[in-house]
């Protein structure tokens, strides 16, 4: 299954299981673009090619009364290794994505990698607390 097919499955799950939850999926992230299209997309995204694939715009209270403003998910297809045996990120691109996720967490969002549909579903269900 491609990353773009995974995004579609996760979006379908959200629409079915949590119909009132607002979310945005970056459909273009898994699609091969021409050099011109890629350049235009990069300019439109502020030069940030490591932006997460999905955002769930549902704030929630955490322990100690802190608000988490929403959930960003960087989706990876099944079988993707995020790290090497040494603990380093597997690729430069994954390292860039991890940096963006860290920066989003610092700003009050939950931000995680999810490898495969089951991991994404579990992350979403845990974040939304089973509300539908």
Q: What are these model-derived regions, one by one?
A:
Residues 1-132:
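Catalytic phosphate/metal-binding cores of nucleic-acid and nucleotide-processing enzymes, i.e., regions
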């Amino acid at each position: 299954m491609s990353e773009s097919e995974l995004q579609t499955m996760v979006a379908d799950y959200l629409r079915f299981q949590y119909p009132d939850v607002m979310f945005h999926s970056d459909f273009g992230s898994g699609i091969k673009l021409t050099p011109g299209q890629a350049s235009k997309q990069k300019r439109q995204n502020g030069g940030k090619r490591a932006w997460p694939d999905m955002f769930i715009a549902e704030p929630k209270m955490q322990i100690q009364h802190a608000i988490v403003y929403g959930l960003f998910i960087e989706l990876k297809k099944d079988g993707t290794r995020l790290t090497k045996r040494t603990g380093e990120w597997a690729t430069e691109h994954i390292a860039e994505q991890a940096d963006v996720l860290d920066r989003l967490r610092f700003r009050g969002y939950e931000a995680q990698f999810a490898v495969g549909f089951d991991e994404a579903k579990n992350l979403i269900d845990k974040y939304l607390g089973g509300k539908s």
